[in-house]
Amino acid sequence: MSKLHIYVSVVLLLLVASLAGCAPAPAPTQAPAAAPTAAPAQPAAPAAPADPLADLIKAAQAEGELTTIALPRDWANYGEVLDTFSKKYGIKLNELDPNAGSGDEIQAIKANKDNKGPQAPDVIDVGLSFGPSAKAEGLIQPYKVSTWDTIPDTVKDPEGYWYGDYYGVLAFEVNKDAVKNVPQDWPDLLKPEYKGQVALSGDPRTSNQAILAIGAVALANGGTFANPQAGLDYFAEMNKVGNFVPVIAKPGTVASGETPISMFWDYLALGDRDKFAGNPTIEVVIPPSGVIAGVYVQAISAYAPHPNAAKLWMEFLYSDEGQLLWLKGYVHPIRYNDLAARGVIPADLAEKMPPADIYAKAIFPTLEEQTALKEYVVANWEKVVGAEVK
């Protein structure tokens, strides 16, 4: 811009300012009322975390059903476990043959490979030795629950085909109204006073509980899991003298006096003691010369008609809620140590369990030992003992 242009611009500005100064002042106006101060915005509530099982729950509910097998409602508090699961997720339960043994469960899968109806089990709860054999035969499928890392490595398949659920030790459940002198150890059961009173909880050719009872007696008499002949000889003698009752013992047969001395897992016997509430009076004895602990395992059938419901069932069982429901039934849930470490076991539940020193002598047979024991007993029970348990 030239100096002349700058000069003219300045003159014009001065002229405008002079005229403005001569104009009358505008009437004063009131300041507008201040708008009310808005309350500071509250931070939005954090969104509830998404349920990591939401998709599985939806898929399971779409299937609508779950078929179980060999889950007596008076075993390990399974009645409450089943009802809680069904009510929580709205899934109908089809409960097959509650009194079946582990071998029967495996046969049910084999017999219903092509059956998507109500006779085909979705899930099984079997003795430890049955898990690996079922995997080898292609009868079960892998699935790792959310709490997988808190299940001890020694009782689970690394690929997730089967995993331990709970354990207990073998005990005598004795109806004191029918038995005057309560037996305290394995040798006592051969005494003449117990004629027609002693029973197993299943057929030793198919029942894991009965097989381990023979293993316990074998150890008490100098045998081994690999060679439990001493256990078979013991039952052969018991059968010979008439003390053995070839009836599958149940709570009802104990109460009626048909099998007043029965060999059960401690958690079943303790549960019966509470349930009978003195009518009849039940005494639970853990024989000191052969304390055998047994672990059961869960698995999903490779042919499950309701695979998502089966997976949700597993998630429920291995959640804190499911594990504590089992504890109410006197079993030691497989995640017990994790629950205890986090302080989530209610005091009243902990106090109901037998003293820990009772379990100090407990022997946990390895998978290989259980497999050897099962094979020996299944092959030799009939020819050595000769009793048809049913």
Where are these regions (language model features)?
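A ligand-binding cleft/hinge motif common to bilobed small-molecule-binding domains
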Residues: G131-S133, P260-P280
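Mature extracytoplasmic/periplasmic domains
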Residues: I292, Y296, S301-A362
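Short amphipathic alpha-helical coupling segments at ligand-binding clamshell hinges
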Residues: V81, I91, D185, N227-Y234, ...
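Short, low-complexity disordered leader/linker segments with a strong preference
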Residues: M1-E63, V389-K390
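Extracytoplasmic ligand-binding site segments that recognize negatively charged/polar headgroups
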Residues: T67-D83, N94-K110, G117-E258
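Conserved C-terminal helix/tail region of periplasmic/extracytoplasmic solute-binding proteins
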Residues: P40, A47-A48, G252, A356-K390
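Periplasmic-binding protein-like
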Residues: Y167-L170, L232-E237, N243, A277-A302
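Signal peptide-proximal N-terminal region
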Residues: K58-A59, S86-N94
